[in-house]
Amino acid sequence: MDARSPSRSGSAGSVEADREESSKRLEKTFDPAHFEERWYRTWEEEGRFQPVGPPGSPRFVMVIPPPNVTGRLHIGHAFGRTLEDILARWKRMLGYRVLWVPGTDHAGIATQMVIEKELAKQGIDRRQLGREKFVERVWAWKRDAKDTIQSQIRRLGCSLDWTRERFTLDPDLSLAVRHAFVRLYREGLIYRGRYVVNWCPRCGTAVSDLEVVHRETEASLYRIRYDVSGVPSGAVVATTRPETMLGDTALAIHPDDPRTAKFRGKTATLPIVGRELPVIEDPILVDREFGTGIVKVTPAHDANDFASARRHRLPEVVVIGPDGKMTAEAGEYAGLDRFEARKEIVKRLAAENRLLGTDPHRFSLGHCQRCDTVIEPYLSTQWFVKVGPLAEPAIRAVETGAVRFVPEMWTKTYFEWMRNIHDWCISRQLWWGHRIPAFTCANGHVIVAEEDPEACETCGSKDLEQDPDVLDTWFSSQLWPFSVFGWPKKTQDLEDFYPTDVLVTGYDILFFWVARMIMAGIHFTETVPFSTVNLHGLVRLAGEKMSKTRGNVVDPLVAIEEFGADALRFTYASSATSGPTVTLDRERLAGSRNFATKLWNAARFTLSQLEGKPHARSLEGRALSLPDRWILSRLSTTAADVNRHLATFRFDEAAQALYGFLWHELCDGYLEMVKPVLSGRDGDDDAREIARGVLEHCLVDSLALAHPFMPFLTEEIWEKLTGRPGTLIVSPYPEGDPAWLDPGAERAVERLRALVTRVRNFRGERRVSPTEPVALSVEASPEEVEEIRSLEPLLRHLARLAEFRFGPPTDGAQKDIVSGVAVGLALPAGKAATDRESVARRLSQVEGEIGELSAKLQNPAFLERAPGDVVEKTRRRLRELEERRAALGTAASE
């Protein structure tokens, strides 16, 4: 059933009864600012965003990827939220009880950085304020940022249930975080230890592997000579970081490398410092295929060296502190920045003839994702999650299809990461976030508990100190799909709405967030948190992902003010390809606004035809004309196509199908065909009534089809058309009525439009006025002649023909193949001389298009990935062009 049925949408027969005949008309000029805010308020006040529906109706649940409270949303966030809202509105109109949960993320490190920058503008350091006052400042910022973000999302038209809005530091969600931490700790999956971690000196905290961005960097490889007992030539060690050599506690060789056998059991002396270093044998650490076969071991500043030190019981000497400056262990270099120390140490080595040379070296250098500071491997005590046992069930969930990724290509990426996953450092040396629920008593006992303990459970001491660190933001975010519903409490919402159905998010947080949610969902709730993950591309500006901390953010409200929310939304939808990058520009936004204006004007025309004029209230059993049958068939096909594309998350193809139907077929096609009937120049009263009824039916279903993409515009037109304000959002979604499908009518009108297009192009090629009369001849089979003869009145009207006949072309006429039939085109006497340049130009254009289509059909990727009907359409177009080339070649030779 589709929106044609009065029981579903009130189209055709029932619209008339509700319309106030002398009514409110659409303004002449399309100005979305006049109605966007009003419609959002209406929907919200009437509870349209809440999950209501008849008993037994299916449900559809999503949780928003919570935006960070670092400030305003950028145009990239708005992209993802638009795609989610298209799904929510589509499912709601299909009869689902839709719940889409809003919320925001405290975003520990990102938000703290923003506030520190704001304080720096006032000459204030957070340490001057102290932890409590600083956190108060962040809470004040959060309140303003949340209001701003909520306002932006509302302006975009997102149909979120604001009565269920959540924040990751809300009391209930904080309880969930503590519960999860304590449970994992008691299960032995959270542990505390001293390890080398990724450290950002600028942010002053440890960061996870995923928060490190690696970039290829040109550097120098320094060759340094170490004295070795019993080996007069010493040992040559190469390093890119001579400043760390002050923390060396050994040299290492491979036990099976004959080149370094002379160093076995020897002792080296550390240059500058004079510390004795044992030469150890470590086949895991040393790659005998690389370099000299002997390496320095700096346990406190390299993760691999740290592991080797644990195997060989080596001491750990920290020479670079958490601020990126050299420590007291660095002796005379203490207090210097690490990079300044490098220069001074290189000078000293050169002066002592220990620097044997430098070589250019290209390697991958880690940078902080947030501030771009070079990451320092740093030995410190941190909290970790043992991820391996959590990853195994999450891998199986995707293997068995319990969770699927769209596009499917991300499945392989997911497996590769999950099968090589490392333990997760979850502690952060920050003030803003979830404090780690671990307490140490005066006697050194550690208590991990959901509630703050009053005394040590081991010794009874009441002198307790909570761990100063906070949890990685992603620790709380991984619980989002179920913590928003009240977990770990067994709430009604948790029972009704968990697990969710679909997650829509950017591919860049597949590992940060999506994978961790799958692991957490399975571990804590024994089910996957969602069944489908749609990973979309990223909106980029000048080749870079948009980010508030990078300072390259574009506010979506700027685009909304200029083009309207519907135009921005439609631009997003039509740009949502399956690729990794989404490019937005003013040209696309202007094109979408033009599309909205086109629909607005079509609605104004339709309303002018319906107001006070008789029209068919039902199309059943009426004598429909060819244009009527064609547009109803195309409408039904388009409805089915849009549903199919949305079901497979091809928002771009759904938008293109909608655009093609509304602009090219309904407005430029059907309206032009029936204007003579509507104006009274052609046809009788019955034909006019039917045409008006068809026009109304098409507008009703078109508004419903377009609503998920352009909700404000369609609701405004719907009110004027039906007299039922605010109801389109819950009206049934057209799914396509097979009863209207008419392949014969589609084929005939496709041929008609191809002939009209060719005549118009002919005028353009000859550089004559669009109103210049043209003579057209058609040479075809008897069956084709019969079909084309039925098209003659429309053909003469649309193509503005001076003459039309069947038979061979006249002398001097331009020959061509159009829609499988031979045609001849000529200007009236006096203008009919053959224009060889025009023919040659047309032939060149056809040759170029043939080349493009041939290349496409020879591309294996196109043949494998494109839908079958698209491939077949391309082949058909190629055959037509080859026939046209033959005809043009003949004309050019005459």
List the predicted regions and their residue ranges.
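Alpha-helical recognition segments enriched in aromatics with Gly/Pro capping
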Residues: 285, 312-324, 430-433, 437-442, ...
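Catalytic adenosine-cofactor/nucleotide-binding cores of aminoacyl-tRNA synthetases and other
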Residues: 367-371, 538-542, 547-624, 722-724, ...
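Acidic, turn-prone loop/beta-hairpin segments
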Residues: 105, 201, 208-213, 454, ...
